[in-house]
Amino acid sequence: MDPCGDPAVPGGDCPQTRGPGLQGASGQEGPLQGTCVDSSHSEHEDRNRMSEELIMVVQEMKKYFPAERHTKPSTLDALNYALRCVHSVQANSDFFQSLGPRGAHQADVTVYSLEDLTALASEHTSKNTDTFAAVFSFLSGRLVHISEQAALILNSKRGFLKSVHFVDLLAPQDVRAFYAHTAPTQLPFWNNWTQRASQYECAPAKPFFCRICGGGDREKRHYSPFRILPYLVHVHSSAQPEPEPCCLTLVEKIHSGYEAPRIPVDKRIFTTTHTPGCVFLEVDERAVPLLGYLPQDLIGTSILTYLHPEDRPLMVAIHQKVLKYAGHPPFEHSPVRFCTQNGEYVILDSSWSSFVNPWSRKVSFIIGRHKVRTSPLNEDVFATRIKKAASNDKDIAELQEQIHKLLLQPVHASASSGYGSLGSSGSQEQHVSITSSSESSGHCPEEGQHEQMTLQQVYASVNKIKNVGQQLYIESMARSSVKPVAETCVEPQGGDEQKDFSSSQTLKNKSTTDTGSGGNLQQEQPSSSYQQMNCIDSVIRYLTSYSLPALKRKCISCTNTSSSSEEAKPIPEVDSSQRDTEQLLDIRKQETTGPSTDIEGGAARTLSTAALSVASGISQCSCSSTSGHAPPLQSESVAVACKPWALRTKASHLAAGGFKHVGLTAAVLSAHTQKEEQNYVDRFREKILTSPYGCYLQQESRNRAQYSCVQAGSTAKHSRCAGSERQKHKRKKLPAPVDTSSPGAHLCPHVTGLLPDEQHWGPSASPSPLGAGLAFPSALVVPSQTPYLLPSFPLQDMASQGVGVSAAWGAAAGCPPLSAGPQAVAAFPSAYVDTLMTIFLHNAPLFPLWPPSFSPYPSLGAAGSSELAPLVPAMAPNPEPTTSGHSQRRVEENWEAHSEELPFISSRSSSPLQLNLLQEEMPAPSESADAVRRGAGPDAKHHCVTGPSGSRSRHCTSGELATATAQQESAAASGSSASSIYFSSTDYASEVSENRQRPQDRQRDEALPGAAEESIWRMIERTPECVLMTYQVPERGREEVLKQDLEKLQSMEQQQPLFSPAQREELAKVRSWIHSHTAPQEGHLQSCVACEDRGSVGDTAEVLEQHPAEDTS
C-alpha cells in the first residue's frame, strides 16, 4: 500500500461515517439543533478540502524527487527532501545577504547600470544564437536582467522570466551544483576578464552545467542542458541606492555531439578518473555532448553501472593490467560499450593509466582516456530514456569488491610513480593531441620496457646498499675519532699500530670494493625510481642515527687509536681491559725519554682558536665506561702517567698549519657556543660597569668574599648517574697527580682508572719545573659551560717548590710572577682577577692565573666580582689522614691570610655547560668568615655530607674549609647532578659511609656550624633605595589559586590523549605499573666517592651493562 494515501484516509472516511449519523440526529431533534449540524458539516467539508490539497502538494513534491532514487518515494521521504531544499536555499540566501555590498572586495570594482548590462549582453550573445546572458541578484535571487533571445531559447514568455528567481528555472538535481559554482567569493570580476581578454583565449571562470527549462505547466516542462560561465558584477539601479552585487552568467545551450553541427570523429575524445572502487572522481566536460550526462550525474556513481553487462567482467582484467603496469605509460585494452543518457550504447576505445601514491605504494586512482568509435542509434543523447536498463546490483557490487581488493596490493615496480607519460588530465592533450588512442598513447609496455624487478631483487639491492652504507659510516666514525688523536697526542709505536693500520686499510679496501660493485649494479639496472631513492635515503638516515654500542663505550679521548673493525667487537672483560691499559702505559713509559725545549723558546704560549675547537670537541668524548672497567694501577704506573709530556710542538704545529674545513662538527659548535657565551657575558659586564652603580657593585662584591676548598675524586659513575642534563654536558675529570713519596698518596680505584683515558702529559728533561722549561698538560678541561684548553702544570712538583715555583710558572705562562705572599696576588689587575681559579694543596696554596682569553666563566658583575669560574678539582682524595695537626693549622693560617687580602675569591661555583646558569642565582644564607674561623680549629673534624637521596652523588666536606655556598650546593646535589663542588675527605668518611642514614639536618649542622648570620637580606639592606625594585606582587588567596588551577585542569582534561583498551593491555604487558595506576619507581644508583671501595670493579661493570643507554659519549 502506498503511504502517499495515508493523509487521505481519515479525511475521506470522516464524511461517510459520521455524516449520516448527524443527519439522523437532526431529523429527530428540533430546529434549534439544525443550525449546529450545518456548521459541523461545513467544518468537515473544509477538512476534506484541505486534505485533498495536501495530497496534491505531496504528489507534486514527489515529482521533484531526485531521479537517481529508483524506488518509489514515500510521503515522509518527499517531505524530508523538501525540508532539505528549503534549508539549502535559506542558507545560501543568508550567505549572499551577509556579504552585501561590503562583503565583496571593492578594489577596482566597476559599477554597471541596466543599460550597460544590455549592451554587454547583446555584444556577447549576437555571435551565437544559442547563447543568452542573465544577471541575478545575490541579495534577492531574482533576475535583474536577461537577454531578449532567452525567451526564444527557453520557449517561455519574457514577462515570466523577468519576475522569476533564476534558481526556479533549474532542475532540482542541479541546484546544489549551481550554488557550489556561483559563490561570490570564488567568482572573477567581469571587468578584470574583459581587460585580459586579449591575453587569454579562454575565460578564467570555471564553467559548469545545469538543466534549465522555460515556463508552462510543471508536468510539460522540458529541461535542456546548458553550459554556464559565471562572473561577478555590481549593478546600480533606481530601486537600490547602493550598488548591488550580482552574478552575470553567460548561458549556452548544449546539443548532442552526433547531431548537426556534429563533433568531428577524431575529436570525440574525453577523459575520466575513477577510484580503485570504480567510482567516478572526475569527468571531462567534453563527455557531456558525447554521453548526454552532466558531470554531476556521473561523479560519485559506479562506472560499472554504465557498462554493458557483458563488458563488466572485462574491467577486472583491465585493473589487473593497471596494477601490473602502474606508473608506466598508458596501455590499451579491449573496447567496451558505454550506455548514454538516452539508453543507447556507444563503443569506446580506451587507454588506461594510474597514479601511484609514492608513500603508500598503492594505486590512488585510475585515468581513462576514451575515444568514441561508433555513434549511438539515437543520436540525441539528451533525449528522455524510453526503457529502463535492467541492472543487477548484486553483480556490480561483487565486481567492485573484487577490483578494490585487487588494487589494495602495493606496487613494487621500479618505474617512477605518477602518471607516467600521461601527466595529468589537463596536460594529457600535449602528448596525445587529437589523434586516435592507439596512435597517441605510445607503445605497449610489453614491447619496450625493461623486465620488471621482483620483490626479492629489490630486497637484495636494499640490503647491499645498507651494508655498504654501514661500512662507510663506521669508517667515517673511526676517521673522525682517530684523526684528532694523531694530531694532538703522541702516537704509540709497535704492533698495535700496525694491526690498527692493517685493519683500517682492509676496511677501506672492502668499502671501495663494495662501492664499485654498487656502481656496477647501478649501471646494470635502469635509472633509480623515486621509491628506490626514498628507500636509500631512509637507510642512510637510519645509519646516521644508529649508534654502535662499541662506538659509545670505547670512545676514549686521546687514546682511541683502534680501528673501526675493532670497535665493532663487544666490550672486553675487566681483565683484558686491565692488560691493555698496562700495556699502553708500558709503551708510553718507554717513550718518555726525550726532553722538551719548546717552552724555552716560547713557540706556543697560547693555543689557536682551531686548537681550542679541536680540543673542546675531543674533551666531549666520554671516558666513563672504560674507567669503570679499569682496575687500580700500580703507583709507579700512575707516576709515569702523571709526569709531564712535551706536547707543545704539536700544539704549535696545529696553530701554524691551520685546520681544514670539515663542516659543522661538535668542535665547531663548542667553539661557537664558547664565543657566544663570552660575548654575552662581556656585554652584560660592560653594561653593569657603565651604570651609575658600577663602583658600588664592585665594592659590594669585594665585601662579600668567601672561600672554599676543592678536592678531586669524582668517579665516572657519578657523572653518569646525574640525569639528562649531565649527559648532555659531560666533562672529563682531571688526572690528579700524586706525590709517590708521600705515604698516603694512593689514588681511589675509580680515579686511578681515569688516568689511562685522559690526555697525558709529555716528558720533562728535568724533574724540577725550574729546569729547561715548564711543561703544561695538553688540555686542562675546566668544568665550565664549555670545555676549555687551559695551560697548567704538574701539581705534585709545584707543590714542593714553594715560592720559586710560582715565579717560574708566572714567567712560563706569560703572566706577572706570583710571590709567596698574598700581596702579590692581590696586586693583579681586575682582568686577571675575573679569571682566577683557586687550587688548594695540602702543603702550600697556589693561585695559577690564566690570560683573559681563556676565561671559562667571566664574572657577571664588576671587575673583581665574586662570581668566578667553577673550581677545578686538582687533588686526589687521601684514603688515610696523613696530615698532622700542625700542618692543618698552617693551612688554616695561610687561608685566613689569603682571604683577608683576596676579597675576590668566591666558592659560588656553577655547574657544567648549562646556559640557564648564566642567570644570577641567589645564595643560601652564608656564614661569615669569623664563624668559619671559629669552627676551623686544629681539632676540627671532617664530615662527609650525604645528600637527601642516596642515589645521587655524595660530597665529603672539610669542616675547617667549608663555606656557606658549599652548604647550598651540597644540599642541592641530591636533585641535580650539575653541582661541581668537591671537598677533601678524611678519616671520618668511613664512619659516615657505614651509617648513611643520618638525618640531613644533623649532618648539615655538623658540617657547617653557625651558617645563618649573613644572608641575602644583609645585601639588600645595604643596597640603595633607588636600586631596589619598587613594584608589589598582588596578593592571591589560596582558595582562588586552587580554584583557577582546577578549572584549567578540567579544561585541559578533554584535550589529553587517551589510550584505547587494546593499547592499555599492550602497554600493561610491558609496564606492570599501569594496572595499579601508579607512577613507575625510580631506579637507584649509588656512586662511590670515598677511597674505600664501596663496590668492586665488577659492580661497576654490571651497572654499565644494565644501563647502556646512559653510557653515551
Curated annotation (Swiss-Prot):
Pfam family, one: Period_C
Molecular function via GO: kinase binding; ubiquitin protein ligase binding
CDD domains: PAS
Residues covered by region (CSNK1E binding domain): 551-750
BP GO terms, sorted: circadian rhythm; negative regulation of transcription by RNA polymerase II; protein stabilization; regulation of circadian sleep/wake cycle, sleep
Subunit-structure text: Homodimer. Component of the circadian core oscillator, which includes the CRY proteins, CLOCK or NPAS2, BMAL1 or BMAL2, CSNK1D and/or CSNK1E, TIMELESS and the PER proteins. Interacts directly with PER1, PER2, CRY1, CRY2, and TIMELESS; interaction with CRY1 and CRY2 is weak and not rhythmic. Interacts with FBXW11 and BTRC.
UniProt name for this protein: Period circadian protein homolog 3
Gene name linked to the record: Per3
